[in-house]
Amino acid sequence: MEKNMVDLSKRRWFTPNRQPNQSQVRLPWLARPDAFTDECTRCGKCVTACETHIIEKGDGGFPNVNFSMDECTFCYQCAQSCPEPLFVAQSEAPWQAEVNITHHCLAQQQVECRSCQDACPEGVIHFALQIGRTASPQVNSELCSGCGACVSVCPSNAMTVHYTQHIA
C-alpha cells in the first residue's frame, strides 16, 4: 500500500458483528426480477462464482446480494455461472440504484467521517462544506452504479443501497 493511503478495511474493526441495513437485493442483470423466484433453481453456482463473496443464499435458498463485507465489481461471473437463462447481456445496465444515507451517519452527528466518499469508485459521494458544522454527505444518485462499496466501509452502518428497478 502506498504511503498516506487509507486502508479502508481497518475501519471495519470498529463495527464487529454488524448486520446489513438494507432490504433484500437480488442479483444484477436479471432479465425478469419479478419472476426470479419462479425461474431460479437455487443451485448456488452464482454464490460460489462471486469473486467478492457478496452473493449469499437468502430466504428460501434464493441468492441475494449482501454488501456488508464488500462491493459488487460487476464481473458478471454470477450470470456466466448460471445454468438458467435468467440474465441479460453484460453490456446492459445491471440495475438502477440509489444510495440512501440514514440518520446514523457520523457526519450528520457532527463527527468527521468520509469513509463512503473514499470507497466510492464512481466518485458520486461528496461532502458539502458548511459553516460551523461538519461537512454533509451528498450523493449524485444519477451516476451511482449500485456497487455497494460505500456500505461495507461505513463505520455506523448508515449507508443503504435501494434498487429503484432492474433494467431489462
Predicted regions mapped to residue ranges:
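Non-ligating segments of multi-cofactor redox enzymes
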Residues: M1-A168
